[in-house]
Amino acid sequence: MAVKKMVEAVFVVGLVVTMMNVWGAVPVEGAISCNQVVSAMTPCATYLIGNAATPAATCCPSIRGLDSQVKATPDRQAVCNCLKTQAKSYGVKLGKAANLPGLCKVTDLNVPISPNVDCSKVH
C-alpha cells in the first residue's frame, strides 16, 4: 500500500514538473510571434538573402510596421530569437542585415540579425 502511494506521489510530481516546463515554453503574453516577424521581413528577402543592392520598396514600410509593435524587452527578445533562427535557416547576408535598421530608420526593432546573437542580452 505504501509503495502504491509513493508511486502516485512521484507520478504527480513528475506531471507537475512536465506541465511547468511546457508552460514555461509558451511565449510571454504580448510578445510578437515569429509568424509576425517573418511576414514583416518577407518583403526584404531579395535584399537580405538575394543580390538586390537595396531593399525593395515594400521592405522598409513593412519593417517600420513591425517596429511600431515592439513595445518592451520581451518583444525585442522574441524578434531576436525569430531572426536568429531565420538567419540560420535562410543564409541571411549578415552585412546587409546589419544595415537594414539604419536603412529603414527603425528604433525599437534595432536587434541584431545573426545566428550567433545571445537574445537574452537584448533589451
From Swiss-Prot:
Pfam family, one: Tryp_alpha_amyl
Record-linked SMART domains: AAI
InterPro entries from the UniProt entry: Bifun_inhib/LTP/seed_sf, Bifunc_inhib/LTP/seed_store, Plant_nsLTP
Keywords, alphabetical: Disulfide bond, Lipid-binding, Signal, Transport
SS bond list: 34-82, 44-59, 60-104, 80-119
Signal peptide: 1-25
Keyword Signal attributed: yes
An MF annotation (GO) of this entry: lipid binding
BP GO annotations: lipid transport
UniProt similarity note: Belongs to the plant LTP family.
Protein task: Plant non-specific lipid-transfer proteins transfer phospholipids as well as galactolipids across membranes. May play a role in wax or cutin deposition in the cell walls of expanding epidermal cells and certain secretory tissues.
The name this protein goes by in its record: Non-specific lipid-transfer protein
